[in-house]
Amino acid sequence: MNATTAPLPYSAARLHELAHVLIANIRELAHAGWTPATSSNFSHRLDEQHAAITVSGRDKGRLVEEDIMVVDFDGLAVGRPLRPSAETLLHTQLYRRFPEICCVLHTHSPVQTIASRLYAGSDVIRLEGYELLKAFEGNTTHETAVEVPVFANTQDMQVLAAQVDALLDKQSMWGYLIEGHGLYAWGRNMAEARRHLEAFEFLLQCELELLKLRGTRQVVPVPHS
Protein backbone atom coordinates (compact mmCIF):
# COMPACT_ATOMS: atom_id res chain seq x y z
CA MET A 1 0.00 0.00 0.00
CA ASN A 2 1.45 3.41 -0.95
CA ALA A 3 1.00 6.64 0.94
CA THR A 4 -1.92 7.79 -1.24
CA THR A 5 -3.93 4.56 -0.97
CA ALA A 6 -6.67 4.72 1.63
CA PRO A 7 -7.20 1.61 3.74
CA LEU A 8 -10.24 -0.47 2.95
CA PRO A 9 -13.19 0.12 5.31
CA TYR A 10 -13.71 -3.64 5.63
CA SER A 11 -11.64 -6.77 6.22
CA ALA A 12 -10.09 -8.08 3.00
CA ALA A 13 -9.46 -11.41 4.72
CA ARG A 14 -13.13 -11.73 5.65
CA LEU A 15 -14.15 -10.82 2.10
CA HIS A 16 -11.82 -13.52 0.74
CA GLU A 17 -13.39 -16.07 3.08
CA LEU A 18 -16.97 -15.10 2.20
CA ALA A 19 -16.24 -15.01 -1.53
CA HIS A 20 -15.30 -18.68 -1.43
CA VAL A 21 -18.40 -19.55 0.61
CA LEU A 22 -20.62 -17.68 -1.83
CA ILE A 23 -19.00 -19.10 -4.95
CA ALA A 24 -19.22 -22.71 -3.77
CA ASN A 25 -22.91 -22.42 -2.91
CA ILE A 26 -23.84 -20.37 -5.96
CA ARG A 27 -22.16 -22.90 -8.24
CA GLU A 28 -24.36 -25.66 -6.81
CA LEU A 29 -27.49 -23.58 -7.38
CA ALA A 30 -26.37 -22.75 -10.91
CA HIS A 31 -25.82 -26.43 -11.69
CA ALA A 32 -29.36 -27.09 -10.42
CA GLY A 33 -30.64 -24.69 -13.10
CA TRP A 34 -31.78 -21.97 -10.73
CA THR A 35 -29.64 -19.13 -12.18
CA PRO A 36 -30.18 -19.10 -15.98
CA ALA A 37 -28.60 -16.58 -18.35
CA THR A 38 -26.51 -14.75 -15.68
CA SER A 39 -29.67 -14.09 -13.62
CA SER A 40 -29.95 -14.20 -9.84
CA ASN A 41 -27.93 -12.46 -7.14
CA PHE A 42 -26.46 -13.51 -3.83
CA SER A 43 -24.96 -11.75 -0.85
CA HIS A 44 -23.51 -12.24 2.61
CA ARG A 45 -23.13 -9.73 5.42
CA LEU A 46 -19.48 -8.68 5.66
CA ASP A 47 -19.73 -6.54 8.80
CA GLU A 48 -22.06 -4.01 10.42
CA GLN A 49 -21.89 -1.68 7.41
CA HIS A 50 -21.03 -3.78 4.36
CA ALA A 51 -22.11 -6.83 2.39
CA ALA A 52 -20.35 -9.02 -0.15
CA ILE A 53 -22.54 -9.44 -3.26
CA THR A 54 -22.27 -10.84 -6.77
CA VAL A 55 -21.28 -8.44 -9.55
CA SER A 56 -24.07 -7.83 -12.07
CA GLY A 57 -24.17 -9.83 -15.30
CA ARG A 58 -21.77 -12.62 -14.37
CA ASP A 59 -22.37 -16.29 -15.19
CA LYS A 60 -23.23 -17.73 -11.80
CA GLY A 61 -21.86 -21.15 -12.68
CA ARG A 62 -18.42 -19.73 -13.47
CA LEU A 63 -17.84 -17.18 -10.74
CA VAL A 64 -14.35 -16.34 -9.53
CA GLU A 65 -13.34 -14.26 -6.54
CA GLU A 66 -13.23 -11.06 -8.61
CA ASP A 67 -16.95 -11.51 -9.29
CA ILE A 68 -17.75 -10.80 -5.63
CA MET A 69 -17.80 -7.12 -4.72
CA VAL A 70 -18.57 -5.04 -1.64
CA VAL A 71 -21.47 -2.64 -1.14
CA ASP A 72 -22.56 -0.53 1.78
CA PHE A 73 -26.09 -0.80 3.13
CA ASP A 74 -27.23 1.98 0.79
CA GLY A 75 -26.32 -0.33 -2.09
CA LEU A 76 -23.28 1.68 -3.21
CA ALA A 77 -20.07 0.01 -4.38
CA VAL A 78 -17.16 0.16 -1.94
CA GLY A 79 -13.52 -0.49 -2.79
CA ARG A 80 -13.72 -1.40 -6.48
CA PRO A 81 -15.85 0.58 -8.97
CA LEU A 82 -17.95 -2.39 -10.08
CA ARG A 83 -21.67 -2.54 -10.81
CA PRO A 84 -23.76 -4.51 -8.33
CA SER A 85 -27.12 -6.00 -9.22
CA ALA A 86 -29.94 -3.54 -9.75
CA GLU A 87 -31.70 -5.43 -6.95
CA THR A 88 -28.98 -4.78 -4.38
CA LEU A 89 -31.37 -2.68 -2.27
CA LEU A 90 -33.53 -5.77 -1.71
CA HIS A 91 -30.52 -7.37 -0.04
CA THR A 92 -29.27 -4.41 1.96
CA GLN A 93 -32.70 -3.49 3.32
CA LEU A 94 -32.72 -6.85 5.11
CA TYR A 95 -29.24 -6.33 6.54
CA ARG A 96 -30.20 -2.87 7.79
CA ARG A 97 -33.44 -4.06 9.34
CA PHE A 98 -32.34 -7.38 10.85
CA PRO A 99 -28.83 -7.53 12.38
CA GLU A 100 -29.20 -11.31 12.68
CA ILE A 101 -29.66 -11.84 8.94
CA CYS A 102 -26.32 -12.64 7.34
CA CYS A 103 -27.19 -14.18 3.97
CA VAL A 104 -29.67 -13.36 1.18
CA LEU A 105 -30.22 -15.62 -1.84
CA HIS A 106 -32.20 -14.77 -4.99
CA THR A 107 -32.84 -17.41 -7.65
CA HIS A 108 -34.90 -17.88 -10.83
CA SER A 109 -35.83 -21.56 -10.99
CA PRO A 110 -38.69 -22.55 -13.34
CA VAL A 111 -40.77 -23.64 -10.33
CA GLN A 112 -40.34 -20.29 -8.59
CA THR A 113 -41.04 -18.29 -11.74
CA ILE A 114 -44.13 -20.28 -12.75
CA ALA A 115 -45.56 -20.14 -9.22
CA SER A 116 -45.04 -16.38 -9.16
CA ARG A 117 -47.08 -16.03 -12.35
CA LEU A 118 -49.89 -18.37 -11.35
CA TYR A 119 -50.43 -16.78 -7.94
CA ALA A 120 -49.77 -13.16 -8.86
CA GLY A 121 -53.46 -12.27 -8.66
CA SER A 122 -53.72 -13.74 -5.17
CA ASP A 123 -50.75 -11.74 -3.81
CA VAL A 124 -49.81 -14.72 -1.63
CA ILE A 125 -49.26 -18.48 -1.73
CA ARG A 126 -50.45 -20.27 1.38
CA LEU A 127 -48.42 -23.36 2.29
CA GLU A 128 -50.19 -25.47 4.86
CA GLY A 129 -49.96 -28.95 6.37
CA TYR A 130 -46.56 -29.89 4.98
CA GLU A 131 -44.00 -31.59 7.20
CA LEU A 132 -41.29 -29.52 5.52
CA LEU A 133 -42.72 -26.33 7.00
CA LYS A 134 -40.50 -27.19 9.95
CA ALA A 135 -37.52 -26.29 7.75
CA PHE A 136 -38.29 -22.61 8.36
CA GLU A 137 -36.52 -21.21 11.40
CA GLY A 138 -38.82 -21.08 14.42
CA ASN A 139 -41.43 -23.50 13.07
CA THR A 140 -41.74 -26.66 15.14
CA THR A 141 -44.84 -28.29 13.67
CA HIS A 142 -46.50 -29.09 10.36
CA GLU A 143 -49.77 -27.89 11.87
CA THR A 144 -49.20 -24.35 10.71
CA ALA A 145 -49.30 -22.24 7.56
CA VAL A 146 -46.66 -20.13 5.87
CA GLU A 147 -47.73 -17.38 3.51
CA VAL A 148 -45.35 -16.54 0.67
CA PRO A 149 -45.99 -13.00 -0.60
CA VAL A 150 -46.01 -12.40 -4.36
CA PHE A 151 -45.01 -8.84 -5.23
CA ALA A 152 -45.63 -7.24 -8.62
CA ASN A 153 -42.47 -6.90 -10.67
CA THR A 154 -41.08 -3.41 -11.13
CA GLN A 155 -37.82 -1.86 -12.24
CA ASP A 156 -38.07 0.67 -9.41
CA MET A 157 -36.28 -1.03 -6.53
CA GLN A 158 -37.12 1.80 -4.13
CA VAL A 159 -40.82 1.06 -4.64
CA LEU A 160 -40.38 -2.69 -4.25
CA ALA A 161 -38.17 -2.31 -1.18
CA ALA A 162 -40.82 -0.07 0.41
CA GLN A 163 -43.50 -2.70 -0.26
CA VAL A 164 -41.34 -5.40 1.32
CA ASP A 165 -40.65 -3.19 4.35
CA ALA A 166 -44.36 -2.49 4.79
CA LEU A 167 -45.14 -6.21 4.87
CA LEU A 168 -42.24 -6.93 7.22
CA ASP A 169 -43.84 -4.44 9.62
CA LYS A 170 -46.88 -6.74 9.79
CA GLN A 171 -45.56 -10.30 9.69
CA SER A 172 -42.57 -12.61 9.92
CA MET A 173 -41.17 -13.77 6.59
CA TRP A 174 -38.50 -16.17 5.38
CA GLY A 175 -38.79 -15.14 1.76
CA TYR A 176 -41.01 -13.81 -1.02
CA LEU A 177 -41.66 -14.09 -4.74
CA ILE A 178 -41.59 -11.40 -7.42
CA GLU A 179 -44.08 -11.93 -10.24
CA GLY A 180 -42.54 -13.45 -13.37
CA HIS A 181 -39.17 -13.17 -11.71
CA GLY A 182 -38.04 -15.41 -8.88
CA LEU A 183 -37.62 -16.01 -5.17
CA TYR A 184 -35.80 -14.23 -2.35
CA ALA A 185 -34.90 -16.19 0.78
CA TRP A 186 -32.60 -15.38 3.67
CA GLY A 187 -31.21 -16.64 6.94
CA ARG A 188 -28.75 -16.12 9.78
CA ASN A 189 -26.03 -17.86 7.78
CA MET A 190 -25.55 -19.53 4.41
CA ALA A 191 -26.75 -22.93 5.64
CA GLU A 192 -30.01 -21.51 6.99
CA ALA A 193 -30.63 -19.39 3.90
CA ARG A 194 -30.03 -22.45 1.69
CA ARG A 195 -32.42 -24.49 3.83
CA HIS A 196 -35.13 -21.88 3.48
CA LEU A 197 -34.52 -21.54 -0.27
CA GLU A 198 -34.67 -25.30 -0.82
CA ALA A 199 -37.78 -25.65 1.35
CA PHE A 200 -39.58 -22.98 -0.67
CA GLU A 201 -38.56 -24.69 -3.91
CA PHE A 202 -39.86 -28.08 -2.75
CA LEU A 203 -43.11 -26.73 -1.34
CA LEU A 204 -43.84 -24.57 -4.38
CA GLN A 205 -43.24 -27.57 -6.61
CA CYS A 206 -45.71 -29.57 -4.51
CA GLU A 207 -48.31 -26.84 -4.93
CA LEU A 208 -47.81 -26.78 -8.71
CA GLU A 209 -48.12 -30.55 -8.91
CA LEU A 210 -51.33 -30.45 -6.88
CA LEU A 211 -52.76 -27.88 -9.27
CA LYS A 212 -52.00 -30.15 -12.22
CA LEU A 213 -53.57 -33.17 -10.55
CA ARG A 214 -56.68 -31.27 -9.53
CA GLY A 215 -57.06 -29.47 -12.83
CA THR A 216 -59.96 -27.08 -12.75
CA ARG A 217 -61.99 -29.27 -10.44
CA GLN A 218 -63.06 -27.94 -7.10
CA VAL A 219 -62.62 -30.34 -4.20
CA VAL A 220 -66.04 -30.57 -2.53
CA PRO A 221 -66.19 -32.14 0.95
CA VAL A 222 -68.39 -35.22 1.14
CA PRO A 223 -71.11 -34.71 3.78
CA HIS A 224 -71.12 -37.26 6.57
CA SER A 225 -74.34 -39.20 7.06
Curated annotation (Swiss-Prot):
Record EC number: 4.2.1.109
Keyword Nucleotide-binding among UniProt keywords: no
Any one Pfam family match given in the protein's UniProt record, by short name: Aldolase_II
Ligand binding (Zn(2+)): H106, H108
One GO BP: L-methionine salvage from methylthioadenosine
Cofactor dependency: Zn(2+)
GO molecular function ontology, one term from the record: methylthioribulose 1-phosphate dehydratase activity
Family annotation (SUPFAM superfamilies): AraD/HMP-PK domain-like
HAMAP family: Salvage_MtnB
Family per record: Belongs to the aldolase class II family. MtnB subfamily.
Protein name: Methylthioribulose-1-phosphate dehydratase
Organism in which the protein naturally occurs: Xanthomonas oryzae pv. oryzae (strain PXO99A)
